[in-house]
């Protein structure tokens, strides 16, 4: 497939292709951070009322004051239609979403109520470190939404400040420098708009949505008196309040650190997508908008918000793809701090496949023998029960197979996870097996290319595999 490089300059050419076109009526998806699952008429009336009938072209939620040079970092041209088509997304658009964790020492003028305390509370600001970083592509042509998680500890060049962890870019230069840093890391991808939401806003947002039903993979306990951060969650499927969900999102004290946290974030995002299919979410519009007003900073205009939410509200969950910047943990004593070291070649491949950038190297097909395939059992079965599955894979040329630790959540349907973003190879595995569901997300074994999370449907097919692998 011929790809087009969507640098900031070339996005202008790309959007000319889409300008003036109506979005197709079958566009699918759901936009998490604002009002996933909202119907068009309810969104328009709700936003117009909550934002006090401001001009559709204004940016009433923007709290940062950007200089002309900083504004130029973002492609400011239209992303929505004209006239009656204002709620339609007219071209692919990349949004940089930053989740902020801000403590009083991070700001020049901390709120009076945060002073003279014996701990450092989270405050309603956007000046601190980026705790969560996502590049989200809304694409009306493919009818897909792609979320790319950028680990906060990624080692990269921050213009004017040297090699640092990427989460420091916001402290050094706000959303514009962060966008420029992310773009440089990801091969020059154009970034159209930004959104910053702080920790206080995330908790309130999930609470306004009614909480979330999610599987907590293990008991989580953590205590930090200096911030009054207390995490106490039990393993298992359960309903979490906004505050409890925030605990799950922030927990990073396990063997995978920030990468494990990204995996849990993707699990929560997936759960929210499925949960908000319920039309009763419409009743939560006022609460959600209040959260947006108080805890959001974005250069999106009102009509752009409507267009994005309108597109998102019609996206099928199967068209939501969740990726992570490829890389590795730094070795002990390799650097002065621990980092996620990005892998440039893998990044180039991923950006070409999912964000339309020009491939810098010739694309190579994924040969089965080169793919690292992890198997995670969710059924609690004896490992010997997986032998027919492994033999079938080996017979088809998948020779680099390993058993990973079990997947804690019991699954009815096997998940074939494209851990490294190689959806085509995951589809090939699914076709070989004849059962399971492909998921493009980063919740599998981080050392794998493909992770097979075995569900109960394996038992329905096990006899067939046993017969086919007998000599």
Q: Language-model features: where?
A:
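Non-catalytic, solvent-exposed segments at the cell envelope interface
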Residues: 2-471
């Amino acid at each position: 497939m011929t790809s087009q490089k969507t640098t900031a300059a070339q996005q202008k050419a790309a959007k000319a292709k889409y300008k003036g076109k109506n979005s197709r009526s079958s566009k699918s998806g759901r936009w998490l951070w604002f009002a996933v699952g909202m119907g068009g008429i309810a969104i328009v009336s709700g936003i117009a009322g909550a934002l006090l009938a401001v001009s559709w072209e204004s940016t009433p939620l923007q709290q940062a004051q950007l200089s002309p040079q900083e504004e130029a970092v973002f492609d400011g041209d239209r992303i929505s239609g004209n006239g009656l088509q204002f709620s339609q997304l007219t071209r692919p658009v990349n949004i940089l979403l930053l989740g902020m964790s801000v403590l009083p020492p991070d700001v020049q003028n901390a709120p009076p109520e945060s002073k003279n305390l014996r701990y450092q509370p989270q405050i309603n600001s956007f000046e601190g470190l980026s705790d969560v970083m996502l590049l989200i592509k809304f694409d009306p042509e493919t009818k897909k939404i792609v979320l790319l998680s950028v680990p906060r500890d990624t080692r990269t060049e921050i213009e004017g400040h040297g090699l640092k962890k990427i989460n420091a870019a916001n402290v050094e230069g706000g959303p514009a420098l962060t966008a420029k840093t992310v773009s440089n890391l990801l091969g020059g991808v154009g970034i159209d708009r930004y959104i910053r939401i702080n920790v206080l806003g995330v908790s309130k947002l999930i609470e306004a949505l009614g909480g979330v039903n999610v599987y907590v993979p293990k008991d989580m306990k953590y205590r930090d008196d200096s911030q009054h951060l207390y995490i106490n969650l039990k393993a298992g499927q359960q309903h979490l309040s906004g505050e409890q969900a925030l605990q799950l999102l922030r927990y990073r004290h396990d063997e995978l650190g920030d990468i494990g946290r990204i995996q849990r974030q993707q699990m929560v995002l997936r759960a929210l997508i499925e949960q908000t299919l319920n039309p009763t979410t419409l009743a939560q519009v006022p609460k959600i908008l209040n959260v947006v007003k108080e805890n959001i900073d974005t250069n999106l205009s009102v009509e752009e918000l409507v267009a994005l939410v309108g597109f998102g509200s019609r996206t099928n969950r199967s068209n939501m793809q969740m990726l992570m910047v490829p890389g590795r943990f730094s070795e002990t004593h390799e650097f002065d701090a621990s980092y996620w070291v990005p892998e440039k070649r893998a990044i180039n491949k991923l950006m070409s496949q999912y964000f339309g950038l020009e491939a810098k190297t010739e694309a190579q097909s994924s040969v089965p023998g080169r793919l690292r395939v992890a198997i995670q059992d969710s059924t609690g079965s004896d490992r010997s029960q997986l032998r027919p599955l492994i033999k079938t894979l080996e017979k088809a040329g998948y020779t680099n197979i390993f058993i990973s630790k079990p997947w804690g959540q019991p699954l009815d349907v096997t998940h074939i996870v494209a851990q490294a973003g190689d959806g085509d190879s995951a589809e090939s595995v699914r076709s070989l097996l004849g059962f399971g569901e492909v998921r493009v997300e980063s919740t599998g074994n981080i050392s794998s290319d493909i992770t097979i999370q075995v569900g109960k449907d394996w038992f329905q097919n096990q006899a067939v595999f046993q017969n086919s692998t007998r000599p």
